[in-house]
């Protein structure tokens, strides 16, 4: 369980590993979105191919950064992620979002690769979000750390915070709620295959967040499902309703959920 998620949602510095000068690609979008939405912290690009990306100095490797970033975004192919995560551990990075796919959701070798990531994260006490996720938003503070059409949109900050194991579902709910439903969002985070920081970790944080009044969650499965009653009691005591979509209750739904996040620990 992570108790310092304020640092994740409000990072003082962010490093983008694999940052690209092609701003339409997945690896090129996050840096531009952070800039265009007014993120006020320090930005670092890491890619040995470029001297700079979007006006931001580019460093050849994580070890070359002048400071330890609060948050690292990993946008490289699956085969390179384990080495990148080790470098983050050596640098003392507290939080890493792994966007890369090609892990347990693919089966076979991907299962072993994902297990290796979990072991590295545990060894170095890194709060990993992902892999195979779409990123996160902290609307009020301009932390638009992700990719996809919703990240090109400006949103008014609100008091709804949501965590979703599906990026497509979560950001669709956020967009519809904020634009058409009259319930603007404060924070949105996607956890993908969820090897580290869990859906329930984020729900627990939202309960403690004084600016969140309504909590949303999309859950395909949870390895820490035993915490749900406690989470419910905390939310009730705090007067914060939880709206949860729990999928995978039928055999067909379980297969669909497994193919997406490889999360077989149904709650």
Mark where each language-model region is.
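Catalytic-core regions of core metabolic enzymes
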Residues: 1-267
């Amino acid at each position: 369980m992570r108790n310092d998620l304020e640092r994740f949602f409000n990072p003082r510095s962010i490093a983008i590993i694999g940052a690209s000068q092609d701003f339409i690609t997945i690896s090129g979008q996050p840096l531009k979105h952070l800039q265009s939405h007014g993120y006020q912290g320090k930005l670092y690009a890491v890619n040995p191919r470029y001297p700079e990306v979007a006006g931001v100095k580019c460093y050849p490797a994580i070890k070359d950064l002048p400071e330890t970033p609060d948050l690292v975004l990993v946008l490289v192919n699956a085969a390179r992620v384990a080495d990148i995560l080790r470098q983050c551990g050596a640098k003392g990075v507290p939080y890493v979002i792994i966007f890369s796919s090609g892990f347990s959701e693919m089966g076979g070798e991907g299962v072993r690769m994902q297990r290796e990531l979990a072991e590295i994260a545990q060894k170095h006490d890194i709060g990993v979000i992902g892999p195979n996720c779409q990123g996160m938003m902290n609307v009020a503070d301009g932390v638009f750390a992700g990719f996809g059409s919703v990240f090109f949109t400006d949103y008014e900050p609100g008091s709804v915070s949501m965590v979703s194991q599906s990026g497509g579902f979560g950001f669709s709910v956020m967009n519809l709620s904020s634009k058409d439903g009259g319930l603007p969002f404060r924070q949105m985070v996607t956890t993908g295959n969820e090897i580290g920081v869990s859906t329930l970790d984020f729900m627990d944080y939202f309960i403690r967040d004084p600016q969140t009044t309504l909590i949303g969650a999309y859950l395909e499965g949870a390895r820490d499902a035993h915490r749900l009653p406690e989470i419910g009691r905390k939310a009730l005591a705090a007067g914060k309703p939880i709206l949860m979509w729990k999928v995978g209750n039928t055999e067909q739904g379980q297969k669909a959920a497994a193919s997406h996040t490889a999360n077989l620990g149904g709650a």
